């Protein structure tokens, strides 16, 4: 327990109003004497003086008012009396002095004030602040007008009717008049003043709405928001769009173009929808060019937009491929596919010209055998040309599905051979549709922000993962295994796979070969639908996706997805069946497992396929 101090000691330890500098710094008890006892004990009595406290902020001298730092001043607005009405009156924010804040006669209700902001910090040249204040009553008479034309800067300025965010009523907001007045204010010689006029009219039951301006009649055609800032932003965006948008034909012109291209309404529905859309866009573009040339505007600004490549490292050269197909206005469906099949025969020579930097998987494995070799020879690794790979894949699929698939018109439709070839054509359309609808949108969203260094890192990751998978294949030596890229290019084939199929190793790895060359048509169609829907980027609801696949399976016998496939819980592997091509030209039914390997962007880079033959007993 603390010992009680005597009364004499309590008096000496009594707190004083101001301590000396030493006692204040050391936080010890000081006395009223100067020098104090603490300073005398330490032989610093000559330095003992009162601690000076910081003075509080007072009103600045020279008569400067702190209210002038708000950066707001009054600006004269000549408002004609005939335009001032209870329905179209503008509120003006005014800075009233304390002695003039209350007029001689206060209006009973419907007091409307027009306010104006001025964001200008230069007040040196402001000798006086003119002001015009209008107080309007129900009958529209002006109670107080031109109250003062000269207010000294030394008077106290108060803000009247100053909400933080003015409330804008949807029924009384007039965007057109608001921005017209703002445009006129910008044309005035007050170039140094930034004026933003805002209408804020309260709604009362006694308001007379008979005197409406012409702008109020069109008020219903404008888009209103409850926020003043939303209206400003909307109008600014609208002005930008109106200024920068080139001439576009209206709906009647588009419909007339459509009727001219397709006189028969049923012909447009039976034709290819993508071809119809391309022809329509080309026709619309030609009409725009004619309009622009007649008006006299140059279209060079808009033509340069087509030449800009926003994603230079990931692109699809679809316009150049479809340019020749769009030349004919009415090609039949079969004739178009036949022309594409014929053009694919001479496209291989063009692809080889762009394939000078290609290193076959077998040659690359001779250089890189360990992970250390991969990083030592990192200069040899370049981003894989997937654009060229998909072009070769399209050529391979055309040869597989369309080679010798011309349908003879003289043969009856009931012929089994012609029906089978028609199904093959339809299967190819299903494959392309699944790529465009299921795979491409997600892939583009994931790769939209990738740069060239990311693609290089992706290739290094692929090669590193490929080394691990090859080592695993050596350990699990009993399962035929094949590894390919997401584009289908084969990267590795195990010895058991060679023994099962009978193909030569040099045939598969010394050139660009696709896994789809060694599957039948039904297995290829199943692979693309399962890979694009479930395996490429994972899946959430397994049962829902499985039902979706079953429902979306087309009606042809060759394109139906087999019902005997299952999933893993992590979404990286699918078990199904396929028919594997043998060296003698026959197909072997196999149970297969497709496992996907993704990178850090969740983009599939490798697919590992394991095959086990199924021998059926007669």
UniProtKB/Swiss-Prot annotation:
GO cellular component: nucleus
Chain spans, region Disordered: 325-352
Domain PAS: 466-538
GO molecular function term, any single one: DNA-binding transcription factor activity, RNA polymerase II-specific
Domain of life where this protein originates: Eukaryota
Subcellular location: Nucleus
Biased composition (Basic and acidic residues): 335-352
Keywords, alphabetical: DNA-binding, Metal-binding, Nucleus, Transcription, Transcription regulation, Zinc
One Gene Ontology biological process: cellular response to starvation
The entry's DNA-binding region: 20-48
Annotated SMART domains: GAL4 (SM00066)
The keyword Transcription regulation belongs to this UniProt entry's keyword annotation: yes
InterPro entries linked to this entry: ERT1_acuK_gluconeogen_tf (IPR050335), PAS_13 (IPR056751), Zn2-C6_fun-type_DNA-bd_sf (IPR036864), Zn2Cys6_DnaBD (IPR001138)
CDD domains hit by this protein: GAL4
Signal sequence interval, chain numbering: none
Similarity comment text for this entry: Belongs to the ERT1/acuK family.
Role description: Transcription factor which regulates nonfermentable carbon utilization. Binds specifically to 5'-CGGN(8)CGG-3' and 5'-CGGN(9)CGG-3' sequences in the promoter region.
PANTHER family reported for this sequence: GLUCOSE STARVATION MODULATOR PROTEIN 1, ZN(II)2CYS6 TRANSCRIPTION FACTOR (EUROFUNG)-RELATED
Name of the protein in its database record: Glucose starvation modulator protein 1
Organism of provenance: Saccharomyces cerevisiae (strain YJM789) (Baker's yeast)
Taxonomic lineage: Eukaryota, Fungi, Dikarya, Ascomycota, Saccharomycotina
């Amino acid at each position: 327990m603390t010992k009680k101090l005597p009364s004499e000691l309590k008096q000496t330890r009594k707190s004083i109003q101001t301590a000396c500098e030493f006692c204040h710094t050391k936080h010890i008890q000081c006395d009223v004497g100067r020098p104090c006892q603490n300073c005398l004990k330490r032989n610093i009595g000559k330095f003992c003086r009162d601690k000076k406290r910081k003075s509080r902020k007072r009103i600045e001298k020279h008569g400067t008012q702190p209210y002038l730092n708000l950066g707001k001043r009054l600006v004269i607005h000549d408002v004609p009396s005939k335009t001032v009405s209870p329905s179209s009156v503008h509120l003006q924010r005014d800075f009233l002095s304390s002695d003039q804040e209350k007029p001689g006669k206060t209006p009973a209700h419907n007091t409307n004030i027009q306010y104006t902001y001025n964001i200008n910090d230069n007040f040196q040249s402001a000798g006086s602040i003119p002001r015009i204040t209008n107080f309007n009553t129900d009958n529209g008479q002006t109670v107080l007008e031109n109250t003062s034309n000269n207010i000294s800067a030394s008077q106290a300025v108060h803000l009247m009717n100053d909400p933080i965010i003015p409330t804008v009523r949807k029924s009384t907001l007039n965007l057109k008049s608001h921005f017209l007045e703002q445009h006129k204010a910008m044309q005035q010689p007050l170039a140094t003043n930034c004026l933003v006029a805002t209408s804020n009219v309260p709604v009362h039951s006694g308001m007379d709405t008979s005197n409406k301006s012409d702008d109020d009649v069109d008020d219903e055609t404008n888009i209103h928001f409850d926020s003043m800032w939303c209206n400003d932003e909307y109008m600014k965006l609208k002005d930008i769009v109106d200024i920068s948008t080139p001439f576009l034909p209206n709906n009647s012109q588009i419909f007339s173009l459509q009727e001219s291209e397709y006189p028969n309404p049923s012909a447009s529905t039976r034709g290819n929808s993508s071809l119809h859309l391309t022809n329509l866009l080309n026709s619309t573009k030609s009409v725009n060019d004619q309009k622009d040339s007649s008006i006299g505007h140059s279209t060079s600004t808009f033509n340069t937009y087509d030449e800009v490549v926003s994603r230079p490292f990931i692109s699809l050269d679809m316009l150049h491929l479809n340019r020749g197909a769009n030349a004919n206005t009415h090609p039949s469906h079969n004739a178009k596919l036949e022309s594409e099949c014929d053009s694919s025969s001479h496209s291989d020579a063009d692809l080889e010209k762009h394939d000078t930097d290609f290193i076959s998987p077998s040659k690359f494995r001779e250089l890189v055998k360990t992970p250390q070799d991969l990083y030592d020879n990192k200069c040899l690794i370049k981003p894989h040309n997937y654009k060229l790979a998909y072009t070769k894949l399209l050529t391979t699929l055309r040869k597989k599905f369309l080679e010798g698939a011309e349908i003879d018109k003289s043969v009856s439709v009931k012929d089994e051979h012609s029906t089978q070839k028609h199904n093959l054509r339809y299967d190819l359309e299903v494959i392309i549709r699944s790529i465009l609808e299921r795979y491409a949108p997600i892939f583009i969203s994931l790769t939209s922000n990738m740069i060239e260094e990311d693609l290089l890192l992706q290739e290094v990751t692929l090669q590193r993962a490929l080394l691990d998978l090859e080592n695993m294949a050596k350990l699990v030596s009993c399962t035929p295994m094949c590894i390919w890229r997401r584009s289908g290019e084969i990267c590795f084939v195990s010895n058991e796979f060679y023994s099962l199929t009978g193909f030569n190793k040099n045939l598969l790895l010394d050139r660009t070969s696709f896994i789809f060359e060694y599957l039948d048509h039904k297995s290829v169609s199943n692979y693309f639908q399962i890979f694009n829907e479930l395996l490429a980027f994972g899946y959430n609801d397994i049962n829902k996706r499985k039902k979706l696949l079953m429902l979306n399976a087309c009606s042809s016998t060759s394109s139906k997805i087999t019902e005997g496939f299952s999933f893993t819980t992590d979404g990286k592997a699918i078990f199904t069946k396929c028919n594997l091509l043998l060296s003698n030209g026959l197909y072997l039914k196999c149970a297969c497992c497709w496992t996907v390997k993704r990178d850090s962007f969740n983009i599939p880079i490798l697919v590992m396929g394991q095959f086990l033959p199924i021998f059926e007993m007669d």
